[in-house]
């Protein structure tokens, strides 16, 4: 397994691999890997000749008073996960390598970035789109894999790749959950035991909405009320948003259908957690 920190070395390596006719599968992450990341890596291993993992906590997607400084990091552990999953190259650039002092460019994907997380984290998806574009230019992947837990991020990246003709196949992978239903997230490490117990209300609300939809309920108002009632039973939880949207456009809807995204974000103490489901899709 090759570990590369410099942009020039990574680009030179990628060009050489392309000249050899090798396909590159890419999994961009901020590190502190868990089983959700591992599932992306295993799929990437199956789909590409060369598997590249990036570990980079991207400062420009964090807002003021967010958790950039305390975001969990464990390079040694991450390298162990990477080796176990058959990664060929780990790209570990520094912030100054990615964003030198003269850096000025930003990528913005307008409409799909505005609702949901975009409404409460202004500028976040500009930071995501910018770093992903730069990573694509450096790694030169044929395929890139992302988890569906960050559903809006996936939608932003799909739109960006299509609009800019970036030529990368984007694969969205199912949410991976703990045995008790909590969606895996690097930020789960922040949760104290009582907070983690309260956070299970997110997956309970998703299960309740899916069951009601399967039983014939189509009213978004009724489904929203049901989910909010479940979340509100937990005093430690504060809803940021709880919404039903078209899965492709993220536009609001009034009647649920098979292409309806149910997405929610909840603050648990100082930790922000997100979860989602598409109602017409069988859960993994």
Swiss-Prot record:
GO terms for molecular function: ATP binding; pantoate-beta-alanine ligase activity. ATP binds at residues 30-37, 147-150, 176, 184-187. Its EC number is 6.3.2.1. Beta-alanine binds at residue 61. Pfam families: Pantoate_ligase. It catalyses: (R)-pantoate + beta-alanine + ATP = (R)-pantothenate + AMP + diphosphate + H(+). It is an enzyme of class 6 (ligase). GO terms for biological process: pantothenate biosynthetic process. It comes from the Bacteria. The active site is at 37 (proton donor). It is found in: Cytoplasm. GO terms for cellular component: cytosol. InterPro entries: Cyt_trans-like, Pantoate_ligase, Pantoate_ligase_C, Rossmann-like_a/b/a_fold. Pathway: Cofactor biosynthesis; (R)-pantothenate biosynthesis; (R)-pantothenate from (R)-pantoate and beta-alanine: step 1/1. (R)-pantoate binds at residues 61, 153. Catalyzes the condensation of pantoate with beta-alanine in an ATP-dependent reaction via a pantoyl-adenylate intermediate. Belongs to the pantothenate synthetase family. The reaction proceeds by a bi uni uni bi ping pong mechanism. This is Pantothenate synthetase. It comes from Pelobacter propionicus (strain DSM 2379 / NBRC 103807 / OttBd1).
């Amino acid at each position: 397994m090759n570990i590369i920190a410099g942009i020039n070395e990574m680009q030179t390596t990628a060009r050489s691999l392309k000249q050899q006719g090798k396909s590159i599968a890419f999994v961009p992450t901020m590190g502190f890997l868990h089983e959700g990341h591992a599932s992306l890596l295993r799929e990437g291993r199956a789909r590409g000749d060369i598997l590249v993992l990036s570990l980079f906590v991207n400062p420009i997607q964090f807002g003021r008073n967010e958790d950039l400084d305390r975001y969990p990091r464990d390079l040694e552990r991450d390298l162990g996960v990477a080796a176990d999953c058959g990664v060929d190259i780990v790209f570990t650039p520094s912030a100054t390598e990615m964003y030198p002092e003269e850096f000025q460019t930003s990528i913005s994907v307008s409409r799909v970035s505005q609702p949901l997380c975009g409404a409460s984290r202004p500028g976040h998806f500009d930071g995501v789109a910018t770093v992903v574009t730069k990573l694509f230019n450096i790694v030169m992947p044929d395929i890139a894999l992302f988890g569906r837990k960050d559903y809006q991020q996936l939608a932003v990246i799909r739109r960006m790749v299509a609009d800019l003709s970036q030529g990368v196949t984007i694969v969205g992978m199912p949410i991976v959950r703990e045995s008790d239903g909590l969606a895996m997230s690097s930020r789960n490490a922040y949760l104290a035991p009582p907070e983690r117990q309260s956070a299970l209300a997110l997956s309970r609300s998703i299960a309740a909405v899916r069951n009601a939809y399967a039983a014939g309920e189509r009213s978004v108002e009724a489904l929203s009320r049901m989910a909010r009632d479940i979340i509100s039973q937990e005093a430690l939880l504060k809803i940021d948003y709880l919404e039903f949207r078209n899965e492709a456009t993220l536009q609001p809807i009034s009647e649920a259908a098979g292409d309806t995204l149910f997405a929610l974000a909840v603050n648990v103490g100082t930790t922000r957690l997100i979860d989602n489901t598409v109602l017409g899709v069988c859960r993994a």
